[in-house]
Each structure stands twice: as structure tokens, then as C-alpha cells.
């Protein structure tokens, strides 16, 4: 793939866009922290938020915790259009952005910083023109908010740079493992310029009319504002993520909203090494890949559909946020348990794949994560139940349930960096059975104390 550089001015301090439509950075909210016993499994759950204000966690492809391990970053209707942090120990909540954001929130692992994209024109809600990448100094926000000495937003928010409008940049963004570059999606017009002549452009795939290309990935140096082009592909890119342990290693997917002809991909930041991460068969429905350790990516090989020509019933299909999505006949014959399914883990170096576990029935595991030390894997299913797997013994338990199939979204479990707990979003406490809260589920103490024979 071709590679080239754009240069933009790095702005260390720039007047923020008008924020009259937004509340103030540093605003504090009282603790809602509650300990609730899971009514089905008995697990003690820590709800860091507990009122129906429309909370949602960061997607499981990305980091959730600040580098000091004390705060989780999330989205909330409390500050519509901006982001919040909640202290895991005290439950105190603070607004951490002002002026809005778009796309993915990127929480640094090596510093107390947050990165995200923002439209240069705040009246424009979609990508397509120039976007800014913003850095937030979280340590300064937390300290000044606590002391009651908050200053203007520009003291805490720095513009790293602005993308050229011709890139058609989108908000699907990921922070490099070295935390000096941020990678983001590029629109079809620019992406087409970097494809080899004669490359076949893919059309939409499946009933959701998604997946058509081309698209690409570019990066911005968050210290200097330099822009570099990484790669173009002939299909729609989604779920851009990075390997936190290997600088320059990128994982992304062919996004169709369901089954893809070839879901998972990887490439290096210099544009080399582009390849399918897990070469899949037409009968495999691969989804929700997430880098979980230095050498591993977890993903779900779905088993949610009825095997054609067999007895048994399947619940009526629903939209993607419902209790039984992906049942449209137009997806083809994939996603059944006629072939192996489950929570799969691919080694980026050896390219070997193993299945860590699978539920005995139902949809099978869906959104997945794992601990960096290789001990645990975790996944949810269509019922919003959470399953924990011991990767050494292959034992699997139902860890938590009762999070309501009617919830506005899926739990999206994410394992903590130290492998002791899992963050989800849950409607368990909501009277309307939809509004979600931020919840922490502990790995059982008896599991944490396990010792394995070498």
C-alpha cells in the first residue's frame, strides 16, 4: 500500500469551540455507588452508577480505566455530549470534557490523559470534514475539581492537531501502544487513491446494507500534529484498535453489522503486514474481536442460529439491540453449531486459534474480553448473562445474570488490566428495564487464589 505524509500545525493551546451547549468540565456529581447481590448467582456487584440517566461504557476493544487504576471513563446522559469519570472506590463522579466529542474515547495507559475526536464545526454531528484530536489532562481536572479551583476548559484540553478535510476522517480512533500516535478511519474518496490499480471494491454485504468500501486508516502524531497514511482496503473498516504492548500493531475489522466474508484484519502502522487475522470459512460468523494480551486477540465465533433442516425452534429475530439479532436468512448459512463455535483466542505470532469455551445452548458467547496474564476469558450472550472461563482448566461459570434482555445495549464485558474484575453496563437496577448503569463484577476470590501446576 502507498504511504505519504500530511503535516498539520500542532496546537499546544487553542481557544476551545463555543461550549454554550455543554456543561462545565470539572463539574462534580454525588456518589451513587451501591453493592448489590446478583439475584441469580449471588455474586456481589458494585454499581458505580445507579440512577436511570443513560450511562454507557467504552467499547470492549478499548481501555476503560485511568492509568492510576482509580477511575473509569464513561458516557452519560448526565452531561449529554460529554464524558465522565467515576472513582471506583468512592463513587464520586466528575465531568471530564467540555465542548463535546465524537466517536471513541481513548484512555491512556501510560499517563493520566484522555484522547478523542471533535468536529471543528460543533453544529456538524457527523464526520466528513476536518476533525480535531483533543487531549485532556485528567490529573489536573481531578485535582482542580476536588479543590474547587477549576479554570477555563482550555487549561485542561489541548488540540493535538487537525485532520485535513480531504481525508474524510471518522471518529473510530485508537491510541498506539507507545501513546504517541492515534489512528483513525479514512473516508472512501481518499482511501481509493491509495489502493492498487485494479483492486476490486467490495459492495455491501448482508441485510444491514453495510460493508462497502473502500476505506482506510491514517494516524496523527499527538505530540506534533503530523499526519501519516497507513493503509487502504476495498471494504468498510470498523473497530480500529491497537496492541497496547506492541507499538505500531493495529487490529481492525470488515464491518457489515453482522457476518463478514472476512471479519478480522491486522496491519502495522507503516502499512506493512496487512493480512487476515483469523482466515474464516463461509460457515463461521466471527465477531467482536478484542486485543487482550501482548500476543492474543479474543473473538466470538457465533452459534446463535438454527441448523437448517433440523428440529427445534428459534425465538423470533430482533434488531441488533434486541434479544435475538442476526437471524435474517440473508446472512446465509453461517453462525450455527454444526461447526465449532465459542470464545476463540488467536495468537498473533503463531496464528494458532483455540476455543476457550462456549455456553451449552442459547446464543453462545458474543462480546468477549480476557486478562492480559492469560488466566481468564469472559463473554456475554444474548440474554445479557456474563460467563467467566479459567483458561488453564477450561472451567466456565455463569458469573452474573439478571441484566435484562430489554436493556438498551449489550453488557460489553471488559476485563481490568490486573485481571481481578470485569466492567459491564447493566439495566439490572432500571425501572424502565432499558436505562443502563456502570457495574463492576469481581473475579471470585477462590479463582484468584488458584495455583496451577507448571
Short names for language-model regions:
Residues 59-62, 79-121:
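Blade-loop segments of beta-propeller domains
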Residues 410-454:
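Blade-level signature of beta-propeller repeat domains, shared across WD40, Kelch, NHL, RCC1
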Residues 25-27, 119-138, 184-212, 255-258, ...:
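Short, conserved, GDST-rich strand-edge loop motifs in beta-rich repeat architectures
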Residues 62-71, 105-113, 117-118, 172-181, ...:
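Blade-terminus and WD-like Trp-Asp/Gly-His loop motifs, strongest in beta-propeller folds
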Residues 300-312, 318-344, 350-395:
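Loop/turn-rich, solvent-exposed surfaces of beta-rich toroidal or solenoidal domains
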Residues 100-104, 108-112, 116-208, 214-215, ...:
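Asp-box/WD-like beta-propeller blade repeats and closely related beta-sheet repeat scaffolds
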Residues 36-56, 85-101, 138-168, 220-236, ...:
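Multi-bladed beta-propeller domains
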Residues 24-46, 209-215:
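Blade/loop signatures of beta-propeller domains
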Amino acid at each position: 500500500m502507498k504511504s505519504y505524509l500530511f503535516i498539520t500545525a500542532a496546537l499546544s493551546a487553542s481557544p476551545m469551540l463555543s461550549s454554550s451547549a455543554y456543561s462545565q468540565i470539572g463539574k462534580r456529581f454525588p456518589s451513587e455507588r451501591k453493592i448489590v447481590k446478583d439475584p441469580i448467582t449471588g455474586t456481589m456487584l458494585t454499581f458505580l452508577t445507579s440512577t436511570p440517566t443513560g450511562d454507557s461504557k467504552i467499547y470492549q476493544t478499548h481501555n476503560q480505566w485511568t492509568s492510576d487504576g482509580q477511575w473509569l471513563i464513561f458516557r452519560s446522559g448526565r452531561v449529554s455530549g460529554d464524558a465522565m469519570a467515576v472513582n471506583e472506590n468512592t463513587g464520586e463522579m466528575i465531568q471530564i470534557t467540555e465542548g463535546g466529542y465524537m466517536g471513541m474515547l481513548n484512555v491512556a495507559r501510560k499517563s493520566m490523559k484522555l484522547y478523542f475526536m471533535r468536529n471543528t464545526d460543533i453544529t456538524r454531528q457527523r464526520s466528513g470534514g476536518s476533525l480535531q484530536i483533543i487531549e485532556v489532562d485528567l490529573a489536573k481536572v481531578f485535582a482542580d475539581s476536588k479543590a474547587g479551583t477549576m479554570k477555563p476548559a482550555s487549561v485542561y484540553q489541548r488540540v493535538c492537531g487537525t485532520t485535513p478535510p480531504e481525508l474524510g476522517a471518522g471518529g473510530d480512533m485508537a491510541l498506539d501502544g507507545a501513546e504517541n500516535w492515534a489512528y483513525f478511519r479514512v473516508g472512501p474518496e481518499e482511501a481509493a487513491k491509495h489502493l492498487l490499480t485494479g483492486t476490486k471494491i467490495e459492495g455491501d454485504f448482508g441485510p444491514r446494507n453495510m460493508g462497502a468500501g473502500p476505506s482506510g486508516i491514517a494516524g496523527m502524531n499527538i505530540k506534533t500534529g503530523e499526519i501519516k497514511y497507513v493503509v487502504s482496503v476495498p471494504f468498510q473498516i470498523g473497530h480500529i484498535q491497537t496492541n497496547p504492548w506492541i507499538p505500531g500493531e493495529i487490529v481492525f475489522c470488515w464491518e457489515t453489522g453482522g457476518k463478514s466474508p472476512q471479519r478480522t484484519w491486522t496491519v502495522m502502522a507503516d502499512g506493512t503486514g496487512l493480512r487476515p487475522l483469523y482466515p474464516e470459512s463461509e460457515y463461521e460468523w466471527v465477531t467482536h474481536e478484542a486485543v487482550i494480551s501482548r500476543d492474543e486477540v479474543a473473538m466470538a465465533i457465533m452459534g446463535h442460529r438454527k441448523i437448517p433442516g433440523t428440529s427445534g425452534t428459534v425465538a423470533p429475530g430482533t434488531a441488533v439491540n434486541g434479544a435475538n439479532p442476526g437471524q435474517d436468512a440473508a446472512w446465509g448459512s453461517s453462525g450455527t453449531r454444526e461447526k465449532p463455535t465459542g470464545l476463540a483466542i488467536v495468537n498473533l505470532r503463531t496464528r494458532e486459534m483455540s476455543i476457550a469455551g462456549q455456553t451449552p445452548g442459547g446464543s453462545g458467547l458474543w462480546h468477549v474480553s480476557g486478562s492480559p496474564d492469560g488466566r481468564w476469558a469472559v463473554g456475554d450472550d444474548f440474554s445479557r448473562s456474563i460467563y467467566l472461563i479459567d483458561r488453564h482448566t477450561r472451567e466456565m461459570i455463569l458469573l452474573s445474570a439478571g441484566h435484562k434482555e430489554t436493556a438498551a445495549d449489550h453488557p460489553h464485558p471488559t476485563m481490568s488490566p490486573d485481571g481481578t474484575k470485569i466492567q459491564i453496563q447493566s439495566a439490572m437496577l432500571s425501572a424502565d428495564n432499558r436505562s443502563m448503569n456502570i457495574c463492576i463484577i469481581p473475579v471470585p476470590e477462590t479463582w484468584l487464589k488458584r495455583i496451577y501446576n507448571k
